[in-house]
Amino acid sequence: MKSVDAASLPAFLERRPLVVDVRSPVLFRQGSLEGALNIPTADIQQKKHQLPKDRPILLVCERGIQSELAGLYLEADGYAEVYNLAGGLNALKR
C-alpha cells in the first residue's frame, strides 16, 4: 500500500481517486474530504462494498491507522491501487 502525505494530497486528488472515509457514519458526518464515500473498516473487512478494482482508492480516517488496516483488507482482496492518507485527516489540520 502506498501513502499520500498532506503536502502531496492536492496533486494526488487531481488523479480523481475514489476517496473512502473508513470512520463511523457519526464521525463521517462531522466532516471529511469533499466527495468522500463512507464505508467503515468493518464493512471493508466483511466485503460489504462494491469498490471498483480499476480505479485508485484513497482511504482516510482520523489518524491514518484505521485506513491503513482497511487498505490491507483491500490489498488481500486483490486491489492494486490502494493509498492511505498518512497521518489521516488530523494531518490536514496542522
Residues covered by each model-derived region:
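Rhodanese-like catalytic fold shared by cysteine-dependent sulfurtransferases
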Residues: 1-18, 24-56, 63-94
